[in-house]
Amino acid sequence: MCIRDSLLTGEDIDHSDRRENFQNTIFRLLELGALPIINENDTVATAEIKVGDNDTLGAVVACTVKADLLVLLSDIQGLYTADPRKDPGARLIPVVEEITADIEALAGGAGSGLGTGGMATKLRAARMVTGQGCDMIITNGDQPQLLYDIVEGKQVGTRFLGRRA
């Protein structure tokens, strides 16, 4: 599997010609069997054109290209019943069918040290994409093998099920 980083800003989403360009790039990467990794281009993103976090940016891109699946990487395996770094009894939640108030309450516990978002932004991203029928997985970015497992259809991390019309 080939992985390609795609650096975007808010302007790439807001302007139709730039949006079409990044959509075509993502579709071509997928045709070539590459896995697009979406990150905000912090070197050129100003406050006016900044999305703010990669979780939200990934969700916006997934909705724009009508993706079947969005994978968000974290420094933990997924969504837990409690913060796994503080509570040894915390259990991984393998599947979330609906983002309820109880699920949202779990987001306060385990933020990611890898970026600006934490679990709260990951749940907002999940709400955004699942509402468009796209599944989303949160898993550990420190374990690259997990991406292969996802491609092979194995249960990895926490999967949020998209609502199908």
Mark where each language-model region is.
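C-terminal catalytic "cap/lid" subdomain
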Residues: 4-165
